[in-house]
Structure formats: structure tokens, C-alpha cells
């Protein structure tokens, strides 16, 4: 099982696209948060969804989004989970697999903002100030610890083609040989 982490806009979704093209099953914790937020009438906006996610963590524990996402796990083999934000979520997923590997995706803040503005998701931030606020919120949840504990890191500061190449190489060299 691979856990993908990184700050907003770093390239986690693009890594997952590469993994999916190689036969990995993918689960997105952010989709789980958005699904639950929608069911609870939360507006599709970054701040509202972020507050909802934080509130649920406070009520039900830091691993609540891992528990809710895990309901969709079919097998631990060739599974990529995108969006782990804290060590408690990592620990929860370790119950499903004898081998958990964390891949951190890194890009600088300016590059991440440019990417976020291009992807134009309804719940995304629209300014550097908004990105700084979101980064601080995610850091308060413990994402920095997950990144620091990563088994592998891919720096995503060049073209998409180079990032895809780095992602494929990592997946082939470290994960597909074992499958």
C-alpha cells in the first residue's frame, strides 16, 4: 500500500494518475471529505470544507478520514491512498497492509499556487493568502510529520512530463517488482 502526501497543489493527483495507469487502485481522502461535507450541507468552498474536516477530527479523532476512506479498500496490493494528513491516519492504514510506504510530493509554494489556480476546483483557494492559510491549517493537522516520515520523495518543480517520468520510475523500481 502506498500513501501519497504533500501540500496542496504539489502534484498528488498527478502521481495517482500515473499509478492508476499502471494498475493501482486509488482512493482519495479529499473525495471522502467532500462526500461527507456534501451530505451534511457544507458549501463547496475551501474554508468551509476545511473547517468541516477539522471539526470531524475533533469530534471523532484524528484518524476519522482514514477510517471513512478505508471502508472502500478492496485489497492492500497495488493500492494508492492520496491525502493522508497526519500520523494517526498513517497508523490506521497500517492495519490493512503489512507494507505501507509513504511517498511525499514536494513543490514550492509559488508553483503550487499556479497549479491550483489552473485546476480551478470549486473548493480551491484563489490567492497566495488563501494558500498560506490552507498550508497552515494542513500543517496544524500534522501533514509536516507525514512528509518528514516519507520513505520516498519526488520533487515536482519541472514539467509534467518529467514528473510523470519520475513517478513511473519510482513505481516500477520500488513497487511493481514486488507485485
UniProtKB/Swiss-Prot annotation:
InterPro entries: NTP_hydrolase-rel, P-loop_NTPase. It holds the Pfam family AAA_17. Keywords: ATP-binding, Nucleotide-binding. The keyword Ribosomal protein does not apply. GO terms for molecular function: ATP binding. ATP binds at residues 6-13. Belongs to the UPF0200 family. This is UPF0200 protein TV0279.
Amino acid at each position: 500500500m502506498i500513501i501519497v502526501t504533500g501540500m496542496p497543489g504539489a502534484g498528488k493527483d498527478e502521481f495517482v494518475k500515473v499509478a492508476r495507469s499502471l494498475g493501482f487502485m486509488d482512493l482519495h481522502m479529499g473525495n471522502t471529505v467532500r462526500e461527507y461535507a456534501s451530505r451534511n450541507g457544507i458549501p463547496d468552498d475551501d474554508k468551509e470544507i476545511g473547517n468541516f474536516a477539522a471539526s470531524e477530527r475533533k469530534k471523532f479523532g484524528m484518524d476519522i478520514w482514514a477510517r471513512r476512506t478505508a471502508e472502500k479498500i478492496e485489497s492492500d496490493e497495488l493500492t494508492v491512498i492520496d491525502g493522508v494528513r497526519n500520523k494517526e491516519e498513517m497508523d490506521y492504514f497500517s492495519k490493512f497492509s503489512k507494507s505501507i510506504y509513504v511517498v511525499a510530493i514536494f513543490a514550492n509554494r509559488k508553483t503550487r499556487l499556479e497549479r491550483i489556480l489552473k485546476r480551478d476546483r470549486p473548493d480551491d483557494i484563489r490567492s497566495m493568502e488563501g494558500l498560506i492559510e490552507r498550508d497552515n491549517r494542513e500543517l496544524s493537522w500534522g501533514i509536516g510529520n507525514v512528509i518528514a516520515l516519507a520513505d520516498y520523495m519526488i520533487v515536482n518543480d519541472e514539467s509534467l512530463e518529467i514528473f510523470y517520468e519520475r513517478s513511473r520510475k519510482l513505481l516500477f523500481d520500488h513497487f511493481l517488482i514486488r507485485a
